[in-house]
Amino acid sequence: MTELKETLKQLISLPGLSGYETPAREVIRAAWEPLVDEISVSPIGSLHAFRRGTGPDPRPSILLAAHMDAIGLMVTGIQEGLLRFTEVGGVDPRILPGLRVTVHGRRDLPGLVVQPPDYLLEPAQRGKSVGMDHLFIDTGLEGDEVNELVRIGDLASF
């Protein structure tokens, strides 16, 4: 049971955003390889594992199906060292302010999702939940360093 718990912990901490599931797939593959007869990756990145049953025909079959991707964020712009972003998957923007993220740039960078203070928002927006168009990721780095380490299209996981 401890081994299962550790494997699950490892899986949920991996950056396996939709379309970029390779890290998660490799961990799952390593865990399943000793348990199955065949394992392969489809052209679209799905992992297929097969184990032959024992006993007389007809043998029962079991299908275990699960997704291995996770929701996350993608950098869409860089403004004075702050990162603009959009969602990858179904991210509810209400959960984002104050969320710690990892930006997967030229190296992994810790970041925090921040929003402007109320006095910088339009009066109608003050005191309310803001949309993603008002949120940024702040890595705490100077603008030049962010420009060197992060590119538009880089991902951020949480």
Q: How would you name each of these model-derived features?
A:
Residues 1-158:
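N-terminal hydrophobic/helix-forming segments and targeting peptides
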